[in-house]
Amino acid sequence: MKLVVGLGNPGKQYEATKHNIGFMVIDAIADSVSHTPWREEQKAEVCSINVAGEKVLLVKPQTFMNASGESIGPLMRYYKIDPSDVYCIYDDMDLPVGKLRIRPNGSSGGHNGIKSLISHIGTENFPRFRVGIGRPLPQWTVIDHVLAPFSEENQEKVQKGIKDTVKAVLGTLELGIDKGMNQFNPKRRPQR
């Protein structure tokens, strides 16, 4: 069994914010495949899908971003899931809007939701699907940026990014993290 976790904040007022790109991807995955009804479990909204014969839980923690680990840690322990089987989808300001980067592990990079996960599961060794939200405007704080909706001119990039991430998550669930990174991470141009 695997957990696919999308990070975000609960509540209507946060639905369309950049910080909720993880929730948006989870909803898009659920919309693209057959799934069980959503239910509340361990401070999260959870449903099940099947990928290549394996049960996968789609998870949207309802604890607010900075406390996401309070939901994921107990879910992992209840279902006896190894950290390497927890795929986490979240926003990344260091990537351009809609761009995807898959990593097998790593530090929090200053992301408070990831800090909470690391704290509650006790390791940095879980796969991440980082979805770009771009940098704040010069006059904006980081909080202003992540809690604002995407601009109208970025909507096409956002929708493409969500679609690409859905494809990458489902593909990586079938292929494994190493093959998934090879197939779905952007290819680097050779140095000349």
What spans do the regions from the language model cover?
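Nucleotide and nucleotide-moiety/phosphate-recognizing core
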Residues: 2-105, 115-129, 136-141, 156-192
